[in-house]
Structure formats: structure tokens, C-alpha cells
Amino acid sequence: MLGAWAVEGTAVALLRLLLLLLPPAIRGPGLGVAGVAGAAGAGLPESVIWAVNAGGEAHVDVHGIHFRKDPLEGRVGRASDYGMKLPILRSNPEDQILYQTERYNEETFGYEVPIKEEGDYVLVLKFAEVYFAQSQQKVFDVRLNGHVVVKDLDIFDRVGHSTAHDEIIPMSIRKGKLSVQGEVSTFTGKLYIEFVKGYYDNPKVCALYIMAGTVDDVPKLQPHPGLEKKEEEEEEEEYDEGSNLKKQTNKNRVQSGPRTPNPYASDNSSLMFPILVAFGVFIPTLFCLCRL
């Protein structure tokens, strides 16, 4: 007889299957598979203190995080929805909008976020490259209160085209000090998140939020098949190279031939025989010469 836990597990599995079969418009943004399994992230929306959909409208993601409309609209930079025509890999279908819109600027730009309480926080930056199709086309830095927390970000080089990429930056605020990535600075109540103009095109961001907690509390993107395969191939290549090196070394050892014998370790009697022969020939010859 099945226990209560087995019946409950079967019911949840059937509900997930049913939700997957329903079109997104019917099941709504809050009823995705992540919503069924949302018990693990039940407190996530409450821990998020600030969230913005850069270049886009307000949106509530599958985890319940409420992204507000971009406060820089009409003030700084330009909004773009160029990515709306593209599907975004690694993202939940309901949340692709967070990566399809963006804000960029021809100069350094950023956001100010007031922080009232001390504690541990995490800054999550969301990106997707929807325009360029090769690396070294858009490269920029990200600064947090003057600290460079992301250096030379090349989104395409990291994950490829139209693929979600999150930068997760933990920090702590205590006793008037901001600590991030091993650096400390004076904190005056506001976080300044800057996207720094570099040599390659313009800086941008798709969405971002700040939450109280640690990196372990941040929802992760879906796995990237291309990156996983590449990592596996690199591991196999390193293993093969090591094996080949070992085999080659052994092969070279065989080809080098047997060890050269030590001449000092051989028997000295083998050297005495030619000496005795020479001495035996020399004495009679000398005797004959003396009689002449």
C-alpha cells in the first residue's frame, strides 16, 4: 500500500506534466514548473529589496520577484527591445522578457540603491547578447561604489548569442563599511551600480536586483549545454594529453635501448690476458735481438 508521501509525489509530478502541456498564456506567469517547486524559494520575494527590468516594463518572475519599470526611462541612456524577436536560452519562458529588453548608454551610467540595514547582500546582474554575433564587440566593466566587481565583461564570449547570463556579486555592509570581493570602502547609505564605458561599444544591462542573503539563496539559470560540453571536452583532452604523454615517455624509454654497462663493474681478468700475451711475445723477441 502506497504511503502518503508517494501519493503526494505522484500528484505533484502529474501537476507538473499538466502545466507543461498548457500554453504559457493559459497557465500564467506564476504557474510555471518553478512555481510548483517554489517551496524552496518561498521567502525569496521578501528578501529582494530592489529590482529593475532595465529598458522594460514591470514584471513578476517565476520566483515571485517584482521587477519595477526602469526608473531611468527618459532620463539616462536608451531602452531597447531588439531582443524581443529572439528566444533566450537558459531562461524560463515566462522570464525571457527580462533578457529581451535592455538599457544601454554611450557613456558610463548606473543606478542608485538606498540600503538602510546592515547585513549580507547579493547583487544579481542579468545580461544577454542579442545583437553582436562574435566576441570583442561589446566589452565593459561593472563598478559597485567604485569597486570593479566585473572586469572586461564580454557577454558573447561568456555564453554566446541570445543566451541568458547572470553575474552574481556577494557583499556585506557592517559598521559603515562596504566589503566586496576582498575590498573595503566607506558606506554612506547608497549603493552605486555603474556600467562603465570601455573601448568596445556601449555598456548595458538587461535587469538587476539586490537581495538580502548569500549566493546560495540566488536562483540559478538553467544549465548551458554548450558550456558543459566544452568543459567535459577540455577535461577529456587534458586526460588524453596526460595519457599520451605517459605513453610517449614509456615508448621513449623502450627506444632508448638497454642500460649501458658500467665498465668499472666488469671483471678485471679480461684485461690481463692481452697484457700477458704481449709480454710473452716481447721477451723472446728481445732475447733474439740480443744474440745478433
UniProtKB/Swiss-Prot annotation:
Pfam families for the chain: Malectin
Residues annotated as glycosylated: 268
UniProt-recorded Gene Ontology molecular function terms: carbohydrate binding; enzyme binding
This protein's UniProt keywords: Carbohydrate metabolism, Endoplasmic reticulum, Glycoprotein, Membrane, Signal, Transmembrane, Transmembrane helix
Record's compositionally biased regions (Acidic residues): 231-241
Cell compartment(s), UniProt: Endoplasmic reticulum membrane
Main location: endoplasmic reticulum
Biased composition (Polar residues): 245-265
Ranges for region Disordered: 221-265
Disulfide topology: none
Key word Transcription regulation present: no
Residues given in the record as a carbohydrate binding sites: 82, 104, 131-132, 201
Lumenal topological segments: 29-269
Topological type in the membrane: Single-pass type I membrane protein
Ranges facing Cytoplasmic side: 291-292
Family to which the UniProt record says this protein belongs: Belongs to the malectin family.
Role: Carbohydrate-binding protein with a strong ligand preference for Glc2-N-glycan. May play a role in the early steps of protein N-glycosylation.
Binding partners and assembly: Interacts with the oligosaccharyltransferase (OST) complex.
UniProt cross-references to PANTHER family, sorted A to Z: MALECTIN, PTHR13460
Name of the featured protein: Malectin
Species per Swiss-Prot/TrEMBL record: Homo sapiens (Human)
Gene name linked to the record: MLEC
